[in-house]
């Protein structure tokens, strides 16, 4: 090998070594950057919760005590607020921070919403997910899903007679499908909204079934009366929602010998928010859904 060939090969080897080193440096930089980025987006969950609670606790306690004056139920609520927050995904926690920094995010003039029943629009939740590119093309960035939770067939009032607040109507999908849709929406800069029915439950709800069996704990979650005295007083001032199809605001239950308040349809029993257990449990249902 002559000197020229040796020099040429040496230069080639040095160039290859530099290229390999550069590639390694780039790879290392990308790895470090990815680690930093991952750390940056993982929120300090306990610290964030503690700060928010410290800021709001006095107002929250005052409002709760004005309504119920029950320390133990308030303590339970605070504990559950923390538990549900810890169960939120990092993606949702970061979305919380983003919205907290821009409290008027939902008032922007580019907010364009669309409301629909899932089955009428796309068949099921996965169908809605498949249509997101089309909706995004239409500049829709807020999806308002009409009631989709589990309801008794034939007695659903369009989905407003909820039998289970933690179960999607089977023909529409599952909670896993809902969480996947929410995640896909957020990744596309879209918001997901739902109707949360808090005034009443279906008579098929677990609470209503137990109340109908005479369980006092669950009867206290609704408005039960064994005669017409108080119902008649209500009827003097409470307007009727469906005066033609469902007249009156109370339904007689001959199997237990009581009237129950039903301001909508007879199969929708009004919840008694004078009972702190009702407020707490409905809030837990709300938080469960917000975590999807």
Protein language model features and the residues they cover:
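Acidic/aromatic-lined carbohydrate-recognition and catalytic surfaces
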Residues: 2-12, 24-280, 287
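Active-site groove signature of glycoside hydrolases
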Residues: 289-292
